[in-house]
């Protein structure tokens, strides 16, 4: 449910919604939602001074609780 909600929010922000991917990983300290977008859209998802990314984290945290973390993955720099 969280993955779908986050994916829906991010798709509304970006210019290339077909390239949005949200993956979930469970760790000892909670859950991590990794967001991957088209490289041209990364700046939009981060926002000025990180405001958009912070807002996304706040919304997901309100829905999922404290054990959920949202990470934005830069696909240009992944090995």
Curated annotation (Swiss-Prot):
PROSITE patterns: KH_TYPE_1. A probable RNA-binding protein. Keywords: Cytoplasm, RNA-binding. One of its GO terms (molecular function) is RNA binding. GO terms for cellular component: cytoplasm; nucleoid. It comes from Streptomyces coelicolor (strain ATCC BAA-471 / A3(2) / M145). It is found in: Cytoplasm; Cytoplasm, Nucleoid. Belongs to the KhpA RNA-binding protein family. This is RNA-binding protein KhpA. HAMAP family: KhpA. InterPro entries: KH_dom-like_a/b, KH_sf_prok-type, KhpA. Residues 30-79 form the KH domain. It holds the Pfam family KH_KhpA-B. The keyword Flavoprotein does not apply. The keyword Transcription regulation does not apply. It comes from the Bacteria. PANTHER family: RNA-BINDING PROTEIN KHPA, UPF0109 PROTEIN SCO5592.
